[in-house]
Amino acid sequence: MAEISAKAVKDLRDKTGVGMMECKKALQETDGDMEKAVEFLRKRGAAMAAKRADREAKEGVIAVKTTEDSRNGVIVEVNCETDFVARGEDFTKFAEAISEIALANFPENKEALLALSMGDDYQGQTVEQAIEAMTGKIGEKIEISKVGVITSNDSVVTAYVHPGAKLATLVEIGPASTDEVEDLSKDVAMQIAAAAPLVVDRSAVPQEKLAQEAEIYKQQALREGKPEKFVEKIVTGRIEKYYQDVVLLEQAFIKDSSKTVSDVVKETSKRLNKTIEIRCFLRYQLGEK
């Protein structure tokens, strides 16, 4: 067996991020061949990932990024098994690296993201291979549960991350420049995090969902003993309240509850002398489907 120097162990650790003892073992198993040792550690990570595939990964972080021109943004949920690992530097840096790859490529789904290269910092591994290697390094199942992308030509895309990185949002407002809607976009991104709307405007609420809610409210009113002739009016009122809860534009504005989000958007449009709108948003909360 080849003599394994401390420098070789350190070099392998610098290259892979794996612990010193594991690096020494890999070099011993491969007679000191650095490239074979790297491959040994990759296979070890893949084996560990397969072994832990049935484990639940419910902890993690939401990583969100926008391009320098604020025209595009990505949001990614990266999961692990424990909060201890989720708060560790290795995991958080890894999640950030994945979000940077997503921002550079705008993958249309999780599968497309997993197939992308992580670049030279990860020896050209794909995201999927890098996840396997990181699983081997930290000893926990790691997975990407979802990824979202917003791209635009004339809108501002703004991100908000709640402290702890368990909740984050992206919102697109336009047509506008960053200077025109910077304050509004930040406020709306925070609004989405705090108030958890489901859609931008009421036209986007699925009809089947409305019918379901209406039936629930009808049955509630009847159980409460309301006269049947008043039930329809009661249901209509409760549906309006439902809109105020789940429709972003109809929610009370978190910084001034005397206004709705729609009011604030209209005020900004008037100030800019052009019509702007909230075009779409994404809200990721750890563990939510």
Swiss-Prot record:
Q: Name one GO molecular function term.
A: translation elongation factor activity
Cellular component annotations (GO), alphabetically ordered: cytoplasm
Q: Which UniProt keywords apply?
A: Cytoplasm, Elongation factor, Protein biosynthesis
Under the heading SUPFAM superfamilies, the entry gives: Elongation factor Ts (EF-Ts), dimerisation domain, UBA-like
Report if keyword Protein biosynthesis is assigned.
Answer: yes
Q: Which residue ranges are recorded for the region named Involved in Mg(2+) ion dislocation from EF-Tu?
A: 82-85
Among Pfam families, the record links this protein to: EF_TS (PF00889)
Tell me where in or outside the cell this protein is found.
Answer: Cytoplasm
Q: What's its job?
A: Associates with the EF-Tu.GDP complex and induces the exchange of GDP to GTP. It remains bound to the aminoacyl-tRNA.EF-Tu.GTP complex up to the GTP hydrolysis stage on the ribosome.
Q: Which NCBIfam families match?
A: tsf
Instruction: Give the family this protein belongs to, as stated in its UniProt record.
Output: Belongs to the EF-Ts family.
Q: What is the protein's name according to its record?
A: Elongation factor Ts
Protein's organism: Chloroherpeton thalassium (strain ATCC 35110 / GB-78)
What gene name is given for the protein in this entry? Answer: tsf
